[in-house]
Amino acid sequence: MLNDVPGMMFVDHVAISVKTGELEGQAETYKALGFTEIHREEVYGGDQVREVLLRIGEGPNLIQLLEPLNETSPVAKLIERNGGRGGLAHVAFRVADIQTAFDAMKAKGINIIDKAPRPGSRGTRVFFVHPKAFGFLIEVVEEPAK
């Protein structure tokens, strides 16, 4: 179903939820494995997370660590549902044009959480696909114009 979405390019990143207070330790563990930190940000609005983005090798081989800023964060709720443990938060796919991908997925009847593409971290535009569609949460992301 995703291979029929116009402009679908590749896996952009895998997001991992981490418990409050564990972000720095997790980031250091990935750095010890050879990852390089390329971005760090606090994201407010509906997401309410502290994010560290790490890359290994060339290309978009990215891990995004997400720590909830408070108990109302969707990531805090995910950790709670996961028995108090961190783990897979979502898999993100890069697209060439976010609006085209959004419209194509809507036309296919895919259950999209967001009403429209919205700002994400790093200046990206994103939307999320409900986990019931594929068995896990999917983020669709368009990089900012350079």
Name each model feature, range by range.
Residues 1-28, 86-93, 144-146:
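N-terminal beta-strand motif that seeds the catalytic metal site of vicinal oxygen chelate
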Residues 2-7, 50-55, 61-66, 93, ...:
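Vicinal oxygen chelate
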Residues 12, 38-39, 44-48, 70-83, ...:
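A cross-kingdom feature marking solvent-exposed beta-strand/loop segments within repeated
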Residues 26-31, 105:
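Conserved active-site tyrosine of GNAT-family acetyltransferases
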Residues 31-57:
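Acidic (E/D-rich), amphipathic helical modules within compact regulatory domains
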Residues 63-103:
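Ampipathic, surface-exposed secondary-structure segments
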